């Protein structure tokens, strides 16, 4: 073992950098959690970063440790416990690709078996206090049902007692060397993972000893093994490869079987050094199988217990997973207790092993068994294979007047027995997914090979929605191994939008009222032009490098012309499908057949009417377009937030008792939200501009709400929901609880990005959309019957401006977790 540490321990500069990072609103932000030590009146601060901030060239973190505990001492802060610098799987980031490793790293390469449990950090204070931490916490916790740090400490004390070692002596040894012992606690009686650790294999597996410095420094594996032997830890096996070539051969051989020396393992951790600095460099090599299969069995079991459904959407291991369910379901049905324990994480491995025993094979044997592999092949979908069983969906990407419906009708007229056409404008109910449900219902018919899902789909979110519906609903209508190819047809080249606007406007004028929703005579020129301009303004052209457009199996990009463009479009679509999928279009119809089908499509008359906006004075007036009263982010983690409030006020007996009473009496709001904008607050210039931006963003949802409202008024008998969910999200953190005699509110922290705080379905900021309230907040409870929710603004602004009197209670909340709210329109 190395000599005792005699270097500098104070890390004032690191703490300053962490505190600066704590104030960031976006990338690289640090989060603190103050922890009470179990055997001392001292505290430590746990620091962490978002997982996705590690390993980024564009983000420099103050420290790359995953697991960092610093003494709560403003004068002489020291690192109490430290985990490894975050390391990545082979190929996961640029600096774990083999060519980078070859150029920048040097051996020997120490390869240790990756233990499969929960990580535990063990260190000591100068006075002999033993400190045991989980990844991000230590000490007593009331917010979890399993305390990993406490469980790890109990196991440590058992092993020290067995070696007749005093805990304080062990703690002082760690302090003297200024190190953290890093171990994996593996014990199925405490918590099951994927690999099995029965009683005879349970314990703390020591796999590293890190020096408590900001810069990563760790002991060699021979020194780690010495400490493990001396203090009763279980040792992790270490194999050394002197060259990278030897290492890759070793890993390839083990990967072929998913095991090492006949034992199932999750993978390896490889330790080497950087050529340029001789600093330690870690990376990992994880096996996909059989752990993917085991995890899959765990997920389908949980899903069955929760939903009583054995339908699953995993693409691999379909045959053997169905065999597993055949075995497991009768056992689950026979015992609610087994189900209850399974959802808590117990009995997972036992049920898996019972199945393997009944099947007569191990997991590795199943994967390597030729007969089962053949059955897997037979039962799996070959997504690259196209044959007579393959079905097709066509998604147009268009704006109004581009001829998608005429083109679609032409194609269906050519193949009336095998092609179908479902129009979004023919679907009048509130359930948008009826478009996909009706399309799949039609596609499920034996004779139907292709269905055109006719909607404009002019934005990414609409295309994404179609793919999500398809994934969610497919197996409700079709056999699970039906291969569906999705063809995109783009009708509107982005570089011709100006020309498209002029031509499509003339087409809409010419067709007059021959459309379900855009009726020229009723809506008038101004309204129709406004609707069409809105579509063009929001149009997002196809981008095959970006989700969801990269999910299309084939994209047909049409040109745009003046005369008979639908006829030309139909011919191009037929030609391109014939080339890509001759099974669908074996022969291209003759020109006169296509022209006949085209002329028939021109006779098409809509049979369903959809109402958009309002008519002019010469027609029967349609109701005024109703806009939202307010726009909010509805909070999805209600129970978690209530529990967090309870924890944070636990030290105040009076508040705790009052809050308990408010919960019991039902006075606490049943749904929580953050108001983003309100129609009554939009009278000032900036607020008015923001409100207009929100309404422009959600034009489609507002129009759809009004369509449904009119249908309900005409006697559908359904009560319309006054809340409309969008696909946008809001991330936030809780800051402080504000409580006076009238109301209880929570001040929240949103992104301070000047561009806005709302994110779309691609996790990108929506420019210009921010919170209208000066102090973003949640109204938690009204204490007086007549008080308006808007009073929360007054209370929160008082607190933020330090105008706090004796009637106002303020409690700082734990803001380590980022919550998510879905943006809703409230009518």
UniProtKB/Swiss-Prot annotation:
Keywords annotated in UniProt: ATP-binding, Endonuclease, Hydrolase, Kinase, Ligase, Multifunctional enzyme, Nuclease, Nucleotide-binding, Transferase, tRNA processing
Catalytic reaction equation(s): ATP + (ribonucleotide)n-3'-hydroxyl + 5'-phospho-(ribonucleotide)m = (ribonucleotide)n+m + AMP + diphosphate
Annotated GO MF terms: 2',3'-cyclic-nucleotide 3'-phosphodiesterase activity; ATP binding; endonuclease activity; GTP-dependent polyribonucleotide 5'-hydroxyl-kinase activity; RNA ligase (ATP) activity
Gene3D superfamilies named in the record: P-loop containing nucleotide triphosphate hydrolases
GO biological process: IRE1-mediated unfolded protein response; nuclear-transcribed mRNA catabolic process, no-go decay; positive regulation of translation in response to stress; regulation of nuclear-transcribed mRNA catabolic process, nonsense-mediated decay; tRNA splicing, via endonucleolytic cleavage and ligation
Keyword check for Kinase: yes
EC code: 6.5.1.3
Cellular component GO terms held in the UniProt record: cytoplasm; nuclear inner membrane; nucleus
Classification via SUPFAM superfamilies: P-loop containing nucleoside triphosphate hydrolases
Residue numbers annotated as active site: 114
Similarity annotation: Belongs to the TRL1 family.
Function: One of the two proteins required for the splicing of precursor tRNA molecules containing introns. The ligation activity requires three enzymatic activities: phosphorylation of the 5' terminus of the 3' half-tRNA in the presence of ATP, opening of the 2'3'-cyclic phosphodiester bond of the 5' half-tRNA leaving a 2'-phosphomonoester and ligation of the two tRNA halves in an ATP-dependent reaction.
Entry text on domains: Has three domains each corresponding to an enzymatic activity, namely in N- to C-terminal order: ligase, kinase and cyclic phosphodiesterase (CPDase).
Additional remark text: tRNA ligase is a relatively rare protein with about 400 copies per yeast cell. Present with 3110 molecules/cell in log phase SD medium.
Protein name: tRNA ligase
Species, as recorded: Saccharomyces cerevisiae (strain ATCC 204508 / S288c)
Organismal lineage: Eukaryota, Fungi, Dikarya, Ascomycota, Saccharomycotina
Gene: TRL1
């Amino acid at each position: 073992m190395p000599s005792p540490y005699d270097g500098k321990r104070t890390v004032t500069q690191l703490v300053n950098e962490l505190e600066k990072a704590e104030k960031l609103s976006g990338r690289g932000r640090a989060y603190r959690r103050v922890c009470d030590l179990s055997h001392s009146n001292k505290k430590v601060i746990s620091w962490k970063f978002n997982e996705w901030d590690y390993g980024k060239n564009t983000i420099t973190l103050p420290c790359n440790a995953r697991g960092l505990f610093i003494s709560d001492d403003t004068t002489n802060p020291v690192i109490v416990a430290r985990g490894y610098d975050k390391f990545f799987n082979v190929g996961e980031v640029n600096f774990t690709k083999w060519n980078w490793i070859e150029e920048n790293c040097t051996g020997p390469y120490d390869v240790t078996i990756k233990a499969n449990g929960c990580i535990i950090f063990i260190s000591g204070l100068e006075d002999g206090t033993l400190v045991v931490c989980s990844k991000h916490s230590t000490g007593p916790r009331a917010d979890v049902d399993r305390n990993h740090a406490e469980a790890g400490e109990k196991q440590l004390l058992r092993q020290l007692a067995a070696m007749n070692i005093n805990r304080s002596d062990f703690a002082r040894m760690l302090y003297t060397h200024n190190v953290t012992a890093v171990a994996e606690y593996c014990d199925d009686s405490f918590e099951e993972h994927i690999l099995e650790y029965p009683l005879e294999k349970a314990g703390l597996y020591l796999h590293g000893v890190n020096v408590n410095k900001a810069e990563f420094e760790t002991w060699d594996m021979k020194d780690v093994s010495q400490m493990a032997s001396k203090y009763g830890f279980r040792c992790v096996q270490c194999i050394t490869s002197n060259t990278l070539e030897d290492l890759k051969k070793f890993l390839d051989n083990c990967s072929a079987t998913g095991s090492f020396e006949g034992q199932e393992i999750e993978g390896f951790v490889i330790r080497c050094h950087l050529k340029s600095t001789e600093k330690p460099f870690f990376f990992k090599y994880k096996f996909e199988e059989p752990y993917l299969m085991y995890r899959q069995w765990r997920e389908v079991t949980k899903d069955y217990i929760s939903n009583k459904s054995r339908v699953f959407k995993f693409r691999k291991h379909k045959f053997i997973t169905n065999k597993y369910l055949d075995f497991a379901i009768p056992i689950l049905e026979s015992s609610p207790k087994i189900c209850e324990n399974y959802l808590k994480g117990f009995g997972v491995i036992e049920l898996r092993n019972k199945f393997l025993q009944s099947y007569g094979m191990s997991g590795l044997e199943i994967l390597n068994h030729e007969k089962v592999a053949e059955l897997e092949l037979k039962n799996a979908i070959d997504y690259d294979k196209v044959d007579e069983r393959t079905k097709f969906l066509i998604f147009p990407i268009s704006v109004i007047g581009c001829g998608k419906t005429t083109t679609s009708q032409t194609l269906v007229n050519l193949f009336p027995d095998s092609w179908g056409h479902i129009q979004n404008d023919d679907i009048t109910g509130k359930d948008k997914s009826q478009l996909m449900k009706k399309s799949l219902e039609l596609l499920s018919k034996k004779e139907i090979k292709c269905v055109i899902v006719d909607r404009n789909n002019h934005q990414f979110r609409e295309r994404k929605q179609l793919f999500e519906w398809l994934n969610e609903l497919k197996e409700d209508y079709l056999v699970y191994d039906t291969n569906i190819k999705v063809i995109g047809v783009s009708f509107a080249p982005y570089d011709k939008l100006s020309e498209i606007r002029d031509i499509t406007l003339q087409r809409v004028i010419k067709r007059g009222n021959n459309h379900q929703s855009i009726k020229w005579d009723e809506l008038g020129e101004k309204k129709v032009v406004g609707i069409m301009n809105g579509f063009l303004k929001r149009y997002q052209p196809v981008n095959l490098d970006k989700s969801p457009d990269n999910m299309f199996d084939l994209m047909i990009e049409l040109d745009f012309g003046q005369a008979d463009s639908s006829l030309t479009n139909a011919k191009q679509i037929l030609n391109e499908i014939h080339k890509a999928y001759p099974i669908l279009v074996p022969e291209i119809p003759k020109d006169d057949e296509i022209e006949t089908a085209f002329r028939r499509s021109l006779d098409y008359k809509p049979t369903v009417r959809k109402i958009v906006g309002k008519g002019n004075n010469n027609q029967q007036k349609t109701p005024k377009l109703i806009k939202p009263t307010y726009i909010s982010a509805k909070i999805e983690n209600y129970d978690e937030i209530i529990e967090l409030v309870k924890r944070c006020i636990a030290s105040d007996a009076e508040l705790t008792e009052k809050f308990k009473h408010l919960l019991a009496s039902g006075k606490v709001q049943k749904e929580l939200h953050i108001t983003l904008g309100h129609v009554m607050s939009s009278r000032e210039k900036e607020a008015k501009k923001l409100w207009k931006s929100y309404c422009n963003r959600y034009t489609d949802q507002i129009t759809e709400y009004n369509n449904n409202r009119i249908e309900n008024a005409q006697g559908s008998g359904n009560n319309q929901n006054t809340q409309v969910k969008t696909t946008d999200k809001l991330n936030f953190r809780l800051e402080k609880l504000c409580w006076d005699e009238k109301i209880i509110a929570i001040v929240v922290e949103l992104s301070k990005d000047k561009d806005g705080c709302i994110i779309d379905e691609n996790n990108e900021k929506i420019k210009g959309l921010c919170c209208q309230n000066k102090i973003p907040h949640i109204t938690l409870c009204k204490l007086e019957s007549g008080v308006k929710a808007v009073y929360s603004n007054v209370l929160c602004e008082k607190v933020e401006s330090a105008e706090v009197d004796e009637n106002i209670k303020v409690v700082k909340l734990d803001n380590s977790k980022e919550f998510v709210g879905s943006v809703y329109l409230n009518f």
